[in-house]
Amino acid sequence: MNCQQLWLGFLLPMTVSGRVLGLAEVAPVDYLSQYGYLQKPLEGSNNFKPEDITEALRAFQEASELPVSGQLDDATRARMRQPRCGLEDPFNQKTLKYLLLGRWRKKHLTFRILNLPSTLPPHTARAALRQAFQDWSNVAPLTFQEVQAGAADIRLSFHGRQSSYCSNTFDGPGRVLAHADIPELGSVHFDEDEFWTEGTYRGVNLRIIAAHEVGHALGLGHSRYSQALMAPVYEGYRPHFKLHPDDVAGIQALYGKKSPVIRDEEEEETELPTVPPVPTEPSPMPDPCSSELDAMMLGPRGKTYAFKGDYVWTVSDSGPGPLFRVSALWEGLPGNLDAAVYSPRTQWIHFFKGDKVWRYINFKMSPGFPKKLNRVEPNLDAALYWPLNQKVFLFKGSGYWQWDELARTDFSSYPKPIKGLFTGVPNQPSAAMSWQDGRVYFFKGKVYWRLNQQLRVEKGYPRNISHNWMHCRPRTIDTTPSGGNTTPSGTGITLDTTLSATETTFEY
């Protein structure tokens, strides 16, 4: 089972701008990294800029309904110490409402309880887990059937620091309580080291945590409403627990409203379920350890995104994060993208597919998009933003275009040969991106190349993507890119390093 949550140690020595952090400060920094607020640099991964930590703290405080100061105050520390779910917090940035991560293509699901916690009588624990499913079927047209053996859509298990069920181990009592996979993987894991209870304020309430994780398994992300079941932090036992309106709205957005019961023989008009359209043949969920990438992007807040088919995941020093439907994060964006690029200069994210381009600011599409590509060839291979000249590069075949986002770029001399500027990289790259220090990465097949600030491939490349980026178990490394080799060359092409003084409308 490939369990895809983000995990980091809490006592690793780190530095901020060369200053060693004490153990009292390490946990908050790792917390921000673990739950998606702070991205560790890929290169020199023990260095953080103070402004990055301040921005991450502000985002966490805003999401936690705390006073937003960007400072590590007592209230922020206390919030970080609260037990919580192990899934990241990619909140819905468009509104404060629920976040949808995917859905099952059926409404009758089976579940299997593989084992039970030792702190509760078996019948009590089993009843709590069953009630967790009932909470959702009470408000949505879903039915659940428990099976005692064989395959099941959703599988629940308790395990600790070492387990064959999941490669991501738990951390002992407190902190991370449970985690789950999104549809249609169906795994729900609970930390067996927790003191699981029912009907008491002591310990951790099993029914509430189980209902939260089943919500993830059904396709719901975290909610920014602190009283919602799908809030990331466990708020304690609630004797008269019921779903928050945001929880209900989220599950009904996925599966429709539960039809009212028709009493006697009276005819009652029922509202048709409002279910988002789902592709008839969605692309299969990729394996980050073996999939060839469609696109890579260093996005806002320093988060690295990898794209394949209809799915996207974040990449950190801990490996791949959870998989999300592309359209769940960027509403209106299709899968199977050709290229993706984020520009810190303009805060714009551009996605390319076929002869169209989409532009987003964070997770909100800009008005008037998508637009048709008129002056650049369709079906691009890759795109990247280079911080040293603040321009966007677009790649197709053996050529590239250099684009100033804030000026009407003269493309009459483009495309120019890739090998003339980027020495030692392949034609037709499948993905590309740059790092904050000016290094550039090209991806093709199972391998990648790293270029220095002079845009020349460094020694020792290409290297394996799965091992060095996704941190998967070592496999036989094939360093031959798919389709032809390249000839390093340097023709002295000069980069355009001038920036436009005023913003103008760009015709794509």
UniProtKB/Swiss-Prot annotation:
Residues 1-18 form the signal peptide. Strongly inhibited by TIMP-2, TIMP-3 and TIMP-4, while TIMP-1 is less efficient. Binds 1 zinc ion per subunit. Residues 274-287 have a biased composition (Pro residues). Its EC number is 3.4.24.-. The active site is at 213. It is found in: Secreted, Extracellular space, Extracellular matrix. Its main location: secreted. Belongs to the peptidase M10A family. Autoantigen anti-MMP19 are frequent in RA patients. Endopeptidase that degrades various components of the extracellular matrix, such as aggrecan and cartilage oligomeric matrix protein (comp), during development, haemostasis and pathological conditions (arthritic disease). May also play a role in neovascularization or angiogenesis. Hydrolyzes collagen type IV, laminin, nidogen, nascin-C isoform, fibronectin, and type I gelatin. This is Matrix metalloproteinase-19. It comes from Homo sapiens (Human). The lineage of its organism: Eukaryota, Metazoa, Chordata, Craniata, Vertebrata.
